[in-house]
């Protein structure tokens, strides 16, 4: 799945204009289903992307 930070979720689906998912924590979105990820893991993932 892809790491999407600040994803919007509505009833477990990723939608624009929906409720902000996970209180600003990173989300993993797969098949329009959002999963919340711990902040630490999200930061590590982001660091790996920018390296």
Swiss-Prot record:
<dbReference type="GO" id="GO:0090729">
    <property type="term" value="F:toxin activity"/>
</dbReference>
<feature type="disulfide bond">
    <location>
        <begin position="21"/>
        <end position="36"/>
    </location>
</feature>
<protein>
    <recommendedName>
        <fullName>Toxin CSTX-18</fullName>
    </recommendedName>
</protein>
<dbReference type="GO" id="GO:0008200">
    <property type="term" value="F:ion channel inhibitor activity"/>
</dbReference>
<comment type="similarity">
    <text>Belongs to the neurotoxin 02 (plectoxin) family. 07 subfamily.</text>
</comment>
<keyword id="KW-0800">Toxin</keyword>
<feature type="disulfide bond">
    <location>
        <begin position="9"/>
        <end position="22"/>
    </location>
</feature>
<dbReference type="Pfam" id="PF02819">
    <property type="entry name" value="Toxin_9"/>
</dbReference>
<keyword id="KW-0960">Knottin</keyword>
<dbReference type="GO" id="GO:0005576">
    <property type="term" value="C:extracellular region"/>
</dbReference>
<feature type="disulfide bond">
    <location>
        <begin position="14"/>
        <end position="27"/>
    </location>
</feature>
<feature type="disulfide bond">
    <location>
        <begin position="29"/>
        <end position="34"/>
    </location>
</feature>
<keyword id="KW-1015">Disulfide bond</keyword>
<dbReference type="InterPro" id="IPR004169">
    <property type="entry name" value="Spidertoxin"/>
</dbReference>
<keyword id="KW-0964">Secreted</keyword>
């Amino acid at each position: 799945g892809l790491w999407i930070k600040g994803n919007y979720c509505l009833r477990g689906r990723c939608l624009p204009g929906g409720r902000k998912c996970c209180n600003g924590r990173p989300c993993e979105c797969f098949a329009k289903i959002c999963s919340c990820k711990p902040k630490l893991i999200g930061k590590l993932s982001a660091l790996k992307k920018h390296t």
